Amino acid sequence: MRYLITGTAGFIGFHVAKRLIDEGHFVVGFDGMTPYYDVTLKERRHAILQRSNGFKAVTAMLEDRAALDRAAELAEPEVIIHLAAQAGVRYSLENPKAYVDANLVGSWNMLELAKAIAPKHLMLASTSSIYGANEKIPFAEADRADEPMTLYAATKKSMELMAHSYAHLYKVPTTSFRFFTVYGPWGRPDMALFKFVDAIHNGRPIDIYGEGRMSRDFTYIDDLVESIVRLSHVPPSEENRVAPEKATDTLSRHAPFRVVNTGGGQPVELMTFVETVEKAVGRPAIHNMLPMQQGDVPRTFASPDLLEALTGFKPSVSVEEGVARFVEWYDQNYRRAHTTV
């Protein structure tokens, strides 16, 4: 198959593209190479993808509609996987315009592109942050998600709403999948796991917010990629509406549109996560206990029922196994070879 994937120099986009290329598919990757974090890491990811003749890269911003058109002409995609975004809850407090530009204007450009070329399936990356401070657990796709705690979450919810309207108007089958704290090799340096491991190795304290009592539904990257690939083969339609006894389906009554959680439903308390990291690294961390930051939520906890009903799969890699794999990657790429990154 032929895919157009945005954000292929990013953590998740890199892994999704690599999986599809390794399976023999053709992928055009679109990425703006923004300096939100070390661009060298993004360049290294793209360099790996570019070893294959099944990958072509277009470097441009999502706000550049003409560049998106060029990428689509090159890809002739059957499936579009829109992963590029301005990520990060805390950064949205400092630079809100970046979120409006990438997550609203950029996503609107993607919807306009899908309207023009009518792919078999449009897939959009969303986030568990949409659930805000939801007290009902686990978080199900049909739960209220209209009280975002950050601009980042608000832009992602807005993207979902725009996508539903386009799916209704132009009949492009569209799936919005909500991530839950994704981690693993080649992960972002601003994420907790990378920061914790790097700090421990370099003798710096780690900041533990919420006194360590917050919990997160950590999702290992390979599990997420498997979820996305399987969902790509299930474009929303009445033919695959899920029976109520299996899960509450979010398939719209008015459009070929569906929202799906991609978490495994196994939340871990932050202090337990820290202890797991310490064990994998082989030394204790220096703990700097802090209150919750503005915009943080006390917990995330996915219901994987709909994902499993649609694909026969739910994330299962344990935090212990996933953290160990990340530490092994970090040791090979940072601890032993700092000058290469």
UniProtKB/Swiss-Prot annotation:
So what EC number does this one have? 5.1.3.6
Per its UniProt entry, what is the enzyme's top EC class, as one word? isomerase
Instruction: Cite the active-site annotation.
Output: 152 (proton acceptor)
Q: Keywords, A to Z?
A: Isomerase, NAD
Q: Which Gene3D superfamilies match?
A: NAD(P)-binding Rossmann-like Domain
| Gene symbol of the encoding locus | lspL
What reaction(s) does this enzyme catalyze? UDP-alpha-D-glucuronate = UDP-alpha-D-galacturonate
* Originating species: Rhizobium meliloti (strain 1021) (Ensifer meliloti)
Q: What happens when the gene is disrupted?
A: Mutation affects lipopolysaccharide (LPS) production.
Q: Which cofactor does it need?
A: NAD(+)
Molecular-function annotations in GO: UDP-glucuronate 4-epimerase activity
Name the protein family.
Belongs to the NAD(P)-dependent epimerase/dehydratase family.
- For this entry, the protein name equals Probable UDP-glucuronate 4-epimerase
Show the Pfam families listed in the entry.
Epimerase (PF01370)
